[in-house]
Amino acid sequence: MSGHSKWATTKHKKAAIDAKRAKAFAKYIKGIEVAARMGGADTSGNPALELAVSKAKKNSVPNDNIDRAIKRGAGLTGETIDYTEILYEARGPQGTALYIECLTDNKNRAASEVRVAVTRHGGTMADSGSVAYLFERKGVVEVAKTDGLTEDDVLMAVLDAGADEVLDESDVFEVVSEATDLPAIRAALDEAGLEYNNDDPQFRATMTVDLDAEGARKFLKLADAVEELDDVQNVYSNANIPADVMAQLEDDE
């Protein structure tokens, strides 16, 4: 799940921990399978696979699962896995836009499930290009907030590596850069000894839409329903849930 931090913060509080963990595991496993299919099972000769495995390990995916994913992706088990990346566009309540990133081995299934989830929860599918222009591809790295670490500390570590900005987002600092600068950002953080996660290219909204309480409730139900689909890797949005509205949502629980 990806979007404005106010959405992310609320979403984390509302989501079931076990469900999030299972979804995250599936995402990392798919990433490993795709990288192994493209470049083979040897991490030393396949940088994309090495990175995918590193991310999975950082997020506590068991080694057995990782090994099986590498073998499946590389075709060493006799299985054939052919994933396709697809982007769907949708509209939500109060002018919100959703950019839905899927990785699937069945395009018809993915399209059908996304359409059903969107329409059943008050959204509408959008024509190609009618939502995409609201987003830009960025590199985003989440740096863990350790004792004493400040926003300025992170900025100083990554400034010369091409970082556009560092954002203070509740329990992490977000380093935002051009997607092509991600390797340099990772290297700079490693050199500074700073722990980081979720170092991926993401679609970021160029402008956000503020939601009131009713709109936020509808939006979260819609985003949750789409994000829970097996083929969905990420849901990006221009939705912003202001602090006072977020407080109302927390009172609902």
Swiss-Prot record:
One cellular component term from this protein's GO annotations in UniProt: cytosol
UniProt keyword annotations, A-Z: Cytoplasm, DNA-binding, Transcription, Transcription regulation
InterPro entries: Integrase-like_N, TACO1_YebC-like_2nd/3rd_dom, TACO1_YebC_N, Transcrip_reg_TACO1-like, Transcrip_reg_TACO1-like_dom3, YebC-like
Location (main, coarse): cytoplasm
UniProt GO MF annotations: DNA binding
Signal sequence, renumbered to the chain: none
Stated family: Belongs to the TACO1 family.
PANTHER family per the UniProt record, alphabetical: TRANSCRIPTIONAL REGULATORY PROTEIN YEBC-RELATED, TRANSLATIONAL ACTIVATOR OF CYTOCHROME C OXIDASE 1
UniProt protein name: Probable transcriptional regulatory protein KRH_13670
Native species: Kocuria rhizophila (strain ATCC 9341 / DSM 348 / NBRC 103217 / DC2201)
